[in-house]
């Protein structure tokens, strides 16, 4: 258990298992500030956009795909308290901690994977620890639900939320996610994506993402392990 300081001066308890994976993700997010917008040249512009969405009476939508035990969701909620977060994690034990660590926040935690279309896939444990589970359509393994970005964004917009950030860290699953049905990309001012060619050499897992964003008017900024893809202009809600 750790205590995370909040902007209002309070603290929030955050439970972990003491494993290398859990401690690693906590260090990346809360100590190294992997998802902070402040180092970005356009960071203040994005923070200003967040303020305008809130001032309009709507909730900024943050989509957290590969939410693990909830560190990223809690970080985003601390940074953008008026946001609504949809957090997806397909591995059951991780999901249980995600649900516990985000209880009482405006976080819609779902035990599911993300993909280009609704359906099912297999969950595979390659032995990388609790942060390394992968999904594969043709592999043997536990069957898990897949929710499409198109569906999630449509549901959120129908509820009056405005796409703001999509954070995607899905251990190579980006190959399938960005392979088709990518109109939702244009609705998010900011994508934060970890690519996994370093983990999966010769698999081409980054290829579909690169093809998807190459033809769009977006900045492409590498920071740490993540790509920050920032739209030139905002598409609006």
Stretches with model-predicted labels:
Residues 1-237:
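Phosphate/nucleotide-binding beta-alpha loop and adjacent structural elements of enzyme active sites
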